[in-house]
């Protein structure tokens, strides 16, 4: 479709009207360029897909919404906007689209959040009830759906009242009533525990109401994980050919895709035996009480028992083999080099893939048959079986995918990382098997790039080391396929608005020197606090261990520090804003996650402290396997993995400072390697152009090291 004169005029008119809605609106050349580039791509005038880096201040959200809505209307398609996290998803849904509705009054939009963000009205009814008899219909859930105390029951009753009177849409983020994670776990549900159309509350369920709204909406705000799942199952979203897709925070897409395709399952032999026994009893109950018209051959008891016995024997053999690779009687992990399994293990995985797929098919057949049963049956008993069969289906579906992935030598032209872990839970050791592909470009090509005609991938940071090459390698987007890559200029004058400060540290921030380095950092930080030049400050660390050591050096300043983990992030930011607005000094302290999505302007944040260059951890099975694979191709893992990732992290961290034309301040980076190592210049060259200063560091007093036991963390 060509960009007609009428379409261009519509886009221009909306853009002009938008300027009147936003106080102190500043027209910016990069924003106009982005609107034009997005329009040309979505209309099919230029290229297949567009990856466009839009630095802070460009106004990227409105720059893709305006042309996206115009072209979606012209082509009678749905515009799907996908983000990486709920916070940005909600911002677009609750702020940006309502703003556009002021200039496009008939605009219809909705949001597609994950099932776990919505309340389950069935569970809410049970938890809000004061009469045990009212919960009888919910007894089939096999879950504890009773309030822990009277206060919790009253809170649930208030939530139910708000839901029933349409004061609340059922989204966790859209109520002011405090809901802790434990309560929300019981209030919400997942796919395996949802009765879907069989549920009494189906028509009024917030999750399904939102899903039905998608059919009528012109704009749907989703998230990357949901989009990936929808493209895989051809559900929720419109047909790929009938939608336009914008992937905001697009730099997260490869990781989200990899997470979605990672498979893990418990394979502890006694536990597995129990699951198989429960399934055979479940099938027997279905055959006895809700016999299907056509009997599946595998449902015949003798055949099913033999099938499950073979499956168990293979699992038991796999347990014995995997345990030989790990020290006995303790938590442990074993990774298979280059993802290559011994022949014996590979043969077991291939057979397990077939056997679990057959059980998945059997569970699906029974589930479909149960869902079609009429009201002449005992509804409570029927629903209990539906839930149990749904959970069995979920288990065998995951197992089937796991063993299929384990049977593959490669995925997207790269090895599949495969490893086993032994973990202790409630005094018992459990064995798990894990698989994940190093590259997901083939899957992204199949699900997105080849299926949807035109896609916009955007973010404030898409490049690392001034190059799109890492994004291209990880995502599968490529110029020879007609994809375009554009980096817009920043609208800010960084050279005048701020500077980079690299203190003359005596040591590098290595593990061996960490204590002395932290002591020097704390001394310089204390000097900055005492100067009282800055009200709002941010301190970012590469690890929780380093952050805690730093806090040990500044205990006397603790009241001014708002530390990640003390409270939810949004509350820390709210408190920080209030303090600075009242003329008080306030310091946010956190890890890399604090470097993304934090938007504090002017005095709210005028000094950013960065502990060190944040190279990615090199001890995860995925990173180690990727390193082995790169070396086998005569590629240098540091250049391909570590340096681009560190550059990306540093760009994001530095990007917290200048958020508007009125912002000013300093970025303090406590890492001399930026000036002493060859790669340091490349990292600095990828940052906005700031003047650089190198002040002296006051003497730091190194505290005596205390032996601390590092907490074990699950690695991927």
UniProtKB/Swiss-Prot annotation:
One of its GO terms (molecular function) is DNA/RNA helicase activity. It catalyses: Couples ATP hydrolysis with the unwinding of duplex DNA at the replication fork by translocating in the 5'-3' direction. This creates two antiparallel DNA single strands (ssDNA). The leading ssDNA polymer is the template for DNA polymerase III holoenzyme which synthesizes a continuous strand; ATP + H2O = ADP + phosphate + H(+). Its cofactor is [4Fe-4S] cluster. ATP binds at residues 54-61. It comes from the Bacteria. [4Fe-4S] cluster binds at residues 120, 194, 199, 205. SUPFAM superfamilies: P-loop containing nucleoside triphosphate hydrolases. A motif (DEAH box) lies at residues 131-134, 248-251. The keyword Chloroplast does not apply. Belongs to the helicase family. DinG subfamily. Type 1 sub-subfamily. DNA-dependent ATPase and 5'-3' DNA helicase. Unwinds D-loops, R-loops, forked DNA and G-quadruplex DNA. HAMAP family: DinG_proteobact (MF_02205). This is ATP-dependent DNA helicase DinG. The gene is dinG.
């Amino acid at each position: 479709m060509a960009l007609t004169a009428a379409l261009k005029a519509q886009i221009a008119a909306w853009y002009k009207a938008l300027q009147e809605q936003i106080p102190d609106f500043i027209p910016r050349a990069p924003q106009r360029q982005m609107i034009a580039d997005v329009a040309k791509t979505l209309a099919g005038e230029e290229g297949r897909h567009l990856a466009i880096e839009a630095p802070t201040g460009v106004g990227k959200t409105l720059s893709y919404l305006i042309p996206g809505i115009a072209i979606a209307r012209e082509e009678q398609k749905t515009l799907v906007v996908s983000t990486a996290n709920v916070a940005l998803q909600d911002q677009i849904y609750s702020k940006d689209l309502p703003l556009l509705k002021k200039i496009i009054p008939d605009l219809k939009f909705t949001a597609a959040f994950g099932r776990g963000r919505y309340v389950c009205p069935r569970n809410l009814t049970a938890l809000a009830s004061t009469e045990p008899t009212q919960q009888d219909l919910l007894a089939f859930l096999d879950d504890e759906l009773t309030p822990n105390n009277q206060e919790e029951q009253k809170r649930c009753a208030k939530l139910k009242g708000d839901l029933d009177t349409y004061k609340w849409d059922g989204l966790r983020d859209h109520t002011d009533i405090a809901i802790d994670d434990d309560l929300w776990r019981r209030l919400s549900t997942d796919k395996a525990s949802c009765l879907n159309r069989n549920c009494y509350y189906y028509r009024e369920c917030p999750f399904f109401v939102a899903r039905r709204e998608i059919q009528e909406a012109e704009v749907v705000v989703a998230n990357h994980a949901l989009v990936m799942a929808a493209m895989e199952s051809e559900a929720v979203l419109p047909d790929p050919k009938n939608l336009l897709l914008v992937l905001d925070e697009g730099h997260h897409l490869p990781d989200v895709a990899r997470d979605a395709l990672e498979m893990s399952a418990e394979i502890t032999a006694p536990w597995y035996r129990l699951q198989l026994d429960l399934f055979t009893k479940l099938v027997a109950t279905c055959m006895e009480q809700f016999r299907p018209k056509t009997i599946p051959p595998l449902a015949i008891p003798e055949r099913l028992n033999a099938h499950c016995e073979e499956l168990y024997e293979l699992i038991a053999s796999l347990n014995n083999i995997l345990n030989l690779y790990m020290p006995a009687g303790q938590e442990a992990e074993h990774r298979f080099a280059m993802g290559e399994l011994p022949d014996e293990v590979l043969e077991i995985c291939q057979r397990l893939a077939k056997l679990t797929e057959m059980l998945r098919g059997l569970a699906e057949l029974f589930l479909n048959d149960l869902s079609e049963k009429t009201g002449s049956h005992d509804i409570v008993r029927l629903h209990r079986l539906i839930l149990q069969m749904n959970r069995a289906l979920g288990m065998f579906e995951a197992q089937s995918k796991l063993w299929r992935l384990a049977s593959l030598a490669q995925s997207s032209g790269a090895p599949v990382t495969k490893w086993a872990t032994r973990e202790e839970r409630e005094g018992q050791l459990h064995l798990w098997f894990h698989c994940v592909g190093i590259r997901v470009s083939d899957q992204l090509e199949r699900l997105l790039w080849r299926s949807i005609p035109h896609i916009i991938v955007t973010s404030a940071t898409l490049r690392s080391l001034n190059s799109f090459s890492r994004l291209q390698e990880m995502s599968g987007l490529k110029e020879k396929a007609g994809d375009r890559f554009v980096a817009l200029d920043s609208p800010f004058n960084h050279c005048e608005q701020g500077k980079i400060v690299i203190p003359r540290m005596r040591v590098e921030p290595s593990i061996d020197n960490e204590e002395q380095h932290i002591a020097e950092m704390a001394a310089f930080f204390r000097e900055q606090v005492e100067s009282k030049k800055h009200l709002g400050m941010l301190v970012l660390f590469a690890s929780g261990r380093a952050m805690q050591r730093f806090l040990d050096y500044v205990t006397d300043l603790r009241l001014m520090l708002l530390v990640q983990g003390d409270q939810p992030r949004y509350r820390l930011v709210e408190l920080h804003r209030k303090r600075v607005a009242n003329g008080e000094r306030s310091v946010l302290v956190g890890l890399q996650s604090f470097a993304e999505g934090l938007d504090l302007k002017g005095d709210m944040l005028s000094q950013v402290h960065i502990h060190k260059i944040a190279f990615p951890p090199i001890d995860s099975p995925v990173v180690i396997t990727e390193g082995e694979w790169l070396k086998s191709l005569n590629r240098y893992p540091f250049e391909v993995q570590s340096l681009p990732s560190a550059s990306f992290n540093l760009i994001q961290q530095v990007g917290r400072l200048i958020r508007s034309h009125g912002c000013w301040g300093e970025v303090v980076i406590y890492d001399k390697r930026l000036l002493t190592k060859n790669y340091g210049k490349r990292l600095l060259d990828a940052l906005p152009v700031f003047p650089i200063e190198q002040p002296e560091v006051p003497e730091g007093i190194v505290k005596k090291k205390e032996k601390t036991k590092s907490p074990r963390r699950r690695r991927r």
